[in-house]
Amino acid sequence: YLESRGFQSLLLSVGGNIRAIGKKAVPDGEGEARWTIGIQNPEKSSERTELMAVLIDGLSVVSSGNYERYYTVNGTRYHHIIDPETLFPSACFNQVTILCGDSGLGDALSTAVFNMPLEEGRAYIDSLAGTEALWVLKDGTTVCSAGFWDYVKPE
């Protein structure tokens, strides 16, 4: 919608979904650059608040995880992403981040893939043109779809 209204350069964050339209102006006023978006580290006790940053233009960055919306009962933490097979919180990952052109689709994909076994999720993401994913496993290691690293900002 915003593009149809003439917006050519915009970064929008709504409820944790981030959408980049076009590129941003560089500080010296000469040229443009891709937007830099940090991907939050789901491990709250870590000193490192972001896992990595991605460089995007014309894409959305959407994450689903077990670290923001949860509650604790008798010492057990329950998050909001429910496994449709067990009807309990999904136990596969700490976080899934999706890069794609449509923020609504990214939101649906991040939740759906959060509930899939890793290899099934990877195959599904790899079958979708223009879509990449990052998984944060329970032990904190990361796994990416085939083209995700093309967007990662070098440290």
What are these language model-derived features?
Residues 1-155:
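Mature catalytic core of soluble alpha/beta enzymes
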